[in-house]
A protein has these predicted regions:
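Solvent-exposed interaction patches of small proteins and small membrane subunits
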Residues: 1-66
Length: 66
């Protein structure tokens, strides 16, 4: 498995864990601001995943076709 794929999977697993944590926070009726902060942290990880995927696409699919 490529290093990029391993990093993407690691980030996605982290986001999955955060989403599971969010579900528990909602079930436990946690403070809304804490939930919001966790949502923002999850969004940040998903943005990193998107950047990694687009970067890999540029390197693999776009630049190699020149």
């Amino acid at each position: 498995m490529k290093a990029e794929q391993q990093n993407i999977k690691r980030l996605l697993n982290t986001a999955k864990g955060q989403i599971d944590g969010l579900n528990k926070m909602i079930d436990d009726d946690k403070y809304c601001i804490d939930i919001s902060n966790q949502i923002m942290a999850t969004i940040a990880i998903l943005k990193k995943v998107n950047i990694e995927i687009l970067d890999a696409h540029l390197k693999c699919c776009v630049l190699s076709r020149r």
